[in-house]
Amino acid sequence: MNISLRPAIAAPSPLDSFLTRHRIGIWRVVVSVVLIALITGHSQWDDTWISAALLTVGMLGVTMATVGRLWCALYISGRKSTELVTTGPYSMCRHPLYVCNFVGIVGLGAMTESITLAAILALAFALMYPAVIRSEDHLLSRNFPEFDDYARRTPAFFPRLSLFRSESTYLVHVGSFQRNLADSVWFLGMTIVVNAVELARHAKWLPTFVLLP
């Protein structure tokens, strides 16, 4: 599956539109399934080097995702519907927020110390978000005439570091940024949930019905 897509000038397919409209609901279902598995299961890698590696990767992923989303919010807050943002993180790829989401989602999966749960979250993202990217590219191309040129030189998903550029000063819409702040740090909240489940398991408050690979 190639997430780095060409500019989506054509109208999105019915499936693309469905996934875009219902992505929050779909994610709630996926996350709920993962949480149920985490509550009722236990990592088979517990107290091994694999567990330590997964936890380290998870913490790095969540930290990078949180910082990255805050960086994106500085540039996009208050501008999303009024102008095409092409500097800062948006100079390296067209959808840096989704890049951060992917890194954070995989990080959260790794923090469960289960390769299976991390893979489920990564697969759900890979199946859903190419459609979301196509739909958003189509909308941006309709709203901003300069988008087509921007899309030709800027990858959709995988950042190209050599393209980075930014102004020496940048006006931040503080009110919009503050409203986006909660969305940018929700990974930290989910980290607390995952850690709380692990603490409850070590305290023998939760049953274990299955070992999670």
Curated annotation (Swiss-Prot):
The chain crosses the membrane at residues 24-44, 48-68, 113-133, 180-200. Keywords: Cadmium, Cadmium resistance, Cell inner membrane, Cell membrane, Cobalt, Membrane, Nickel, Plasmid, Transmembrane, Transmembrane helix, Transport. Coiled coil: none annotated. It is a multi-pass membrane protein. GO terms for molecular function: protein C-terminal S-isoprenylcysteine carboxyl O-methyltransferase activity. It holds the Pfam family ICMT. One of its GO terms (cellular component) is plasma membrane. Its main location: membrane. It is found in: Cell inner membrane. InterPro entries: ICMT_MeTrfase. Disulfide bonds: none annotated. One of its GO terms (biological process) is response to cadmium ion. The keyword Nucleotide-binding does not apply. To A.eutrophus CzcN. Component of the NCC cation-efflux system that confers resistance to nickel, cobalt and cadmium. Appears to be involved in metal specificity but affects only nickel resistance. May be involved in nickel transport. This is Nickel-cobalt-cadmium resistance protein NccN. It comes from Alcaligenes xylosoxydans xylosoxydans. The lineage of its organism: Bacteria, Pseudomonadati, Pseudomonadota, Betaproteobacteria, Burkholderiales. The gene is nccN.
